[in-house]
Amino acid sequence: MTTQPSLLSQVEAGVAWITLNRTAQRNALDIPTLKNLHALLDAFNADPAVRVVVLTGSGRSFCAGADLAEWAEAEARGALETYGWTETAHALMTRLHSLDKPTIAAINGTAVGAGLVTV
């Protein structure tokens, strides 16, 4: 079984494209995806060749919000209090909304919960 990266990115003509790529989960945000997205935003913000950042989703959904399966696993381990999703998501949303470059949410389908907050 091969795994797909949770994010795809490319830069074309000054436009940085970031695609949420967890199609089977409707692009739900788990902690690794949140952290990787934050790192990509930092890199694109620092890149002088990038003039604008576009965030979109693969498949039929833009983003289903939090990955509730990951939340359930943390709760089953008794680790929900230290799980850190809310803090990690808040840091990402703050970064997304404070970029020095214009950002565009290319909403290609459902945007729910934290997926809607990215807009």
Feature-to-residue mapping (PLM):
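Conserved CoA-thioester-binding segment of acyl-CoA-metabolizing enzymes
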Residues: 1-58, 80, 94
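Glycine-rich beta-to-alpha active-site loop
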Residues: 93-119
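Glycine- (often His-adjacent) and acidic-residue-rich active-site loop
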Residues: 57-95, 111
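Hydrophobic/aromatic residues within transmembrane alpha-helices
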Residues: 18, 55, 67, 118-119
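Histidine-centered beta-alpha loop that forms part of the nucleotide-sugar donor binding/catalytic region
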Residues: 21, 66, 108
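Residues that form or flank phosphate/diphosphate-binding pockets in enzymes
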Residues: 28, 63, 114
